């Protein structure tokens, strides 16, 4: 009997160990599966907003409002399932929070009847957000590593949240300016050819596109000033050198300089056409490298 009991206890211990090991391997897969399912739902939620580009005549109606709300809801559900905090230093988190900020600002402008016919950009904004969502899902498949997050005294500092908020708003405004610049190029090409296309008819007029791209950049410059000041203050809270220039700070300062130069030239002269578009796209590229670009390098290339 003692031998039988000994063997039974050994089998029970072995079974418990096997269950623990299989559970350890099964849990990450379940967690990964729920995150990917949320990513697919997020992509589907962006399709109605992207489909606005196919409407014969864009309108600010209930279908536009519903597509904006669905895109925002899908992004928030994704952030809730993945647990990506706004202070996370991950690449996917940067893309998803940037998407949500663009949706909220664009939705607010549409509801409040913002700048000249900004709602005509809905389909192109949806396509941009869809590209970001697919990119984030691809990198989620490549590696589901847990990114670093801000901790220590900086986490409880108001400067951190001012810096994060201003960074997201600045990048969203510059993104909207870049999309307005794209609309400007399409309208300018149609006017030169004296043959409007179905794509140019769906976009804001040339003058409205120029007004929006410059206006969005002006707003972004003011918000970026807050971001730069809060960034230096955050360094002080973290005990880092104020004069240490890293890649993110350098690219941000270059982007700010590019925006200020464009605004200065536009106010002092009659800067029009392709030159203004180049400045806008240059500022967008620099801020893209400074925000999600740095996260990509540190998370998947260097890290």
List the predicted regions and their residue ranges.
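Hydrophobic transmembrane alpha-helical segments in integral membrane proteins
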Residues: 31-47, 166-174
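Juxtamembrane boundary at the C-terminal end of a transmembrane helix
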Residues: 291-303
């Amino acid at each position: 009997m003692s031998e039988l009991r000994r063997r039974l206890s050994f089998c029970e211990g072995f079974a418990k160990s096997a269950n623990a090991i299989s559970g350890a391997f099964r849990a990450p897969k379940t967690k990964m599966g729920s995150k990917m399912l949320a990513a697919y739902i997020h992509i589907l939620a962006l399709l109605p907003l992207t489909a606005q580009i196919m409407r014969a005549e864009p309108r600010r109606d209930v279908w536009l409002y519903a597509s904006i709300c669905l895109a925002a809801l899908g992004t928030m559900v994704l952030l809730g399932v993945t647990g990506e905090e706004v202070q996370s230093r991950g690449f996917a988190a940067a893309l998803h929070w940037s998407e949500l900020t663009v949706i909220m600002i664009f939705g607010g402008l549409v509801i409040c009847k913002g700048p000249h016919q900004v709602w005509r950009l809905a389909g192109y904004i949806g396509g941009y957000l869809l590209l970001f969502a697919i990119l984030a899902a691809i990198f989620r498949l490549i590696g589901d590593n847990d990114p670093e997050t801000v901790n220590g005294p900086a986490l409880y500092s108001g400067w951190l949240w001012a810096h994060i908020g201003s960074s997201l708003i600045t990048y969203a405004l510059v993104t909207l300016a870049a999309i307005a610049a794209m609309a400007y190029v399409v309208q300018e090409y149609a006017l030169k050819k004296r043959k409007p296309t179905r794509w140019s008819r769906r976009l804001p007029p040339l003058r409205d596109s120029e007004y929006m791209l410059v206006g969005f950049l002006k707003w972004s410059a003011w918000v970026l000033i807050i971001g730069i000041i809060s960034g230096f203050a955050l360094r002080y809270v973290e005990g880092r050198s104020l004069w240490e220039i890293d890649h993110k700070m350098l690219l941000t300062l270059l982007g700010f300089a590019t925006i200020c130069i464009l605004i200065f030239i536009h106010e002092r002269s009659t800067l029009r056409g392709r030159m203004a578009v180049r400045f806008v796209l240059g500022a967008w590229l620099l801020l893209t490298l400074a925000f999600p670009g740095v996260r990509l390098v540190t998370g998947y290339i260097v890290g």
